[in-house]
Structure formats: C-alpha cells, structure tokens
Amino acid sequence: KYRLNQMRAVYISEIREGPKGQEIIVSRASKELLIGLFKREVPEVAKGSVIIKGIAREAGFRSKVAVYSNQKGIDPVGSCVGQKGVRVQAVIGEFGGLEKIDIIQWFDVPKDYIATALSPAKNVRVELDEKKVAHVFVPGEDLSLAIGKEGQNVRLASKLTGYRIEIEEENAVKTEIEKVEAKEAQTVSETKPSDQTGQPVSKRQGKKKEEKKK
C-alpha cells in the first residue's frame, strides 16, 4: 500500500495521450526498475564496469540478477552485494524488504551458468540436450534448495538461462544405475561359457551336469 506523499522509485514504461492530456504509465514490477536501482546503488554498474547480463523476476517475491565484468580486479557479485550486503539491501529496502534478490555470476558456458543460477543449491551436475533442456542432478540434501518454495528457484533459474530445467536427485540416479549394473552382471554370470564346450551354460544346465557326475 502507498501513502500520500510517500517517495517511491518507479519505472516509466510509457507516456501516452489520454482524454485529459498526457498519461504517464509507471511500473514497479519491471526488470528495468531493478536495473535502475542497481545503477543508483552500485557505482560499478552505473559506470559500466559491472554489467547486468540477465534478470528473472517475480516482483514482490524473488529475483535473480546475473552480473559480469571483463575488467581485472573487479568482483561483479561482490560489487553489487557491497560490504556487509549494504548495496543489495538498499535495493531490497526499496521494495519494503519483501523481495529477495539473488546476485549470481554470469557465465557464457551454459552448464556453468545453469549451475550457478540454481544457487543456493551446490554441487550440481548439469547435462544438456539439443532441445535446450538441462537435466540437473542434485545431491539429496540440496534438492529442496534447488527446487525452491513452490518451485520458485528452479523456475527463476529457467527464465534467467533460457533453458527448461529438469531436476533429479543424484543419489536416486546412482541407485538406479547400480541396479542396472547389478542386473547386467547377473545376466553375464548366468551365461558364462562351459569349460568343456565353450558354449554358454545356464545355472539349470550346470545343475544337470552336476547330477550326471554324481
């Protein structure tokens, strides 16, 4: 809610002619507002030494901002966060402290970018296919972090990177692989060559031979 004479930053999205003159259309939900606030609070962004490469936003709830710098000695994430988080907190304060903002490092390598976009989840493994789908394998202890509340974290990461992201539990995948390998090993053991003929022999055939010997 807004109060009379309350100061609030807005983004002017459109100026148009109305029946009573010019109408100014403003927004507080746009990505451009977020860019403007970082330019205001972070000198490196204002000067262009830190570049905002992408934003995924669900206004009033959470945003992910990917930043990059090609200048040596500049930490783009640290510059935007500020000492003790003072810079990013100033941006969050503009939204009444209600919108969480994740600042991440931008990478031109999709696998690295996707893995970083899913933070705070760590130790994720990313595999890509030709249809811009990312299969991400996450340790069980980080699964809820990767997905986020009501799927928000993975949804924002998908918007930010442009990939459809499918999350799978790493341990569950390993267990399934182990089951398949065990089954294959069992099949091989059941069809080992006979010592005499060199032909595959099943367990049942082996038992018959043992009975004949007796």
List the predicted regions and their residue ranges.
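RNA-contacting regions in translation and RNA-metabolism proteins
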Residues: K1-K214
